[in-house]
Curated annotation (Swiss-Prot):
It catalyses: D-mannonate = 2-dehydro-3-deoxy-D-gluconate + H2O. The lineage of its organism: Bacteria, Pseudomonadati, Pseudomonadota, Gammaproteobacteria, Pasteurellales. Its EC number is 4.2.1.8. Pathway: Carbohydrate metabolism; pentose and glucuronate interconversion. HAMAP family: UxuA. It is an enzyme of class 4 (lyase). It comes from Haemophilus influenzae (strain 86-028NP). This is Mannonate dehydratase. Its cofactor is Fe(2+); Mn(2+).
Length: 394
């Protein structure tokens, strides 16, 4: 696999030099300064690409070309944003970039309630606390009909949790959930956030699928024409939240996805940390079944807690994910492609490392501190080498 690393551009506290020293060769990045929906010009793409190459690295994957909210709701200028998206793909292809990761999550990107959950060893991780999230929905946001999403026991627990919160706790939880995360343009006040949610109140999962299908049928033929692989990222967490439709969460969703738009350019980002939150997702089976459509891998593990809807991000080779067999399946697919003359390795990045060691004293992007990902990348490098020696390079 190609060892890659997410970089948030020139303002990222982790420099390109740091990344090269970590052993990565590919950069996963985006033009975060360009507003969602606007065309990425060839000039801007080349400028970023040159910056990366001057550091001895290559721009391996775009993550992400954001999908404008009006595309997701099919309102306003959605056709304009789709046409802009097509032009961005053409421009990326002209600059030699061949893989684009994106998501179709409504309103929010990945969602956590705690961005600095302290583990027993003193390192810090991202965490999603189901009851804390319920307290936010029911008593802070006060989302209409939110009680329908929770049973009586959960509602009582959420009330108890909320009653113990200080004003500072409320502010911090709200900020964690709605203020936006690295790489995301959106950041909302509570009122603005509810307004965004209201735009989806009449969009069922079935209707939302028709919106995704329309987007795929517009975009994927262009990607196929210009030689770009589109790699959709799953919902994170992979279940409905905030009354929003979530439609990239299960193996059944993956099957619908490839049947809806069967062109080879239409593929997946295998994010083990997102899919792996659900105990009913068999990650090895998912990887094997859709191996020929996996164009990018986010390798990360999560640990479900006593409440199975609560989880925290585990060390990369620990937790609930069968990382050994997932990586083995990815390597099996990579060797199949190589035997058919495809030289493009599957780009892989260590996702969401723990904040640890010297990074505990630094300001870092949540989940994207250097040392935790350095550790994860080294572990995956070792796992890959061992798998190759035992199973592939006999």
């Amino acid at each position: 696999m190609e060892q890659a690393w997410r970089w948030y551009g020139p303002k990222d506290p982790v420099s390109l030099s740091d990344i090269r020293q970590a052993g990565a060769t590919g950069i996963v990045t985006a033009l975060h300064h360009i507003p969602n929906g606007e065309v990425w010009s060839i000039e801007e793409i080349k400028k970023r690409k040159t910056e990366i190459e001057n550091a001895g690295l290559s721009w391996s994957v775009v993550e992400s070309v954001p999908v404008h909210e009006e595309i997701k709701t099919q309102t306003g200028n959605y056709q304009k944003w789709i046409n802009n998206y097509k032009q961005t793909l053409r421009n990326l292809a002209q600059c030699g970039i061949d893989t684009v990761c994106y998501n179709f999550m409504p309103v929010l990107d990945w969602t956590r309630t705690d961005l600095a959950y302290e583990l027993p060893d003193g390192s810090k991780a991202l965490r999603f606390d189901h009851i804390a999230f319920a307290a936010f929905e029911l008593h802070i946001l006060k989302r209409p009909d939110a009680e329908k999403a929770y049973n009586q026991e959960e509602q009582v627990a959420a009330r108890t949790y909320y009653d113990k919160m200080s004003e500072q706790d409320i502010t911090q939880l709200t900020r964690n959930i709605i203020a936006g995360l690295p790489g995301a343009e959106e950041g909302y006040t509570l009122d603005e956030f509810q307004t965004q949610l209201d735009r989806y109140k009449d969009i069922s999962p079935e209707k939302f699928r028709t919106h995704l299908a329309y987007f795929l049928n517009e975009i994927v033929p262009v990607a196929q024409e210009v030689g770009i692989k589109m790699a959709i990222h799953p919902d994170d967490p992979p279940r409905p939240i905030l009354g929003l439709p979530r439609i990239v969460s299960t193996i059944e969703d993956m099957q619908w996805f490839v049947e809806t738009q069967p062109l080879p350019a239409n593929g997946f980002t295998m994010c083990t940390g997102s899919y792996g939150v659900r105990s009913d997702n068999d990650l090895v089976k998912m990887t094997e079944q859709f191996a020929d459509r996996i164009y990018f891998a986010h390798l990360r593990s999560t640990q479900r807690e006593d409440n199975p809807l609560t989880f925290h991000e585990a060390a990369h080779l620990e937790g609930d994910v069968d990382m050994f067999n997932v990586v083995k399946a990815l390597l099996n697919e990579e060797y199949r492609r190589l035997n058919q003359g495809e030289t493009r390795l599957i780009p892989m990045r260590p996702d969401h490392g723990h904040q640890m060691l010297d990074d505990l004293r630094k300001k870092t992007n949540p989940g994207y501190s250097a040392i935790g990902r350095l550790k994860g990348l080294a572990e995956f490098r070792g796992l890959e080498m061992a798998l190759k020696k035992v199973y592939f390079n006999k």
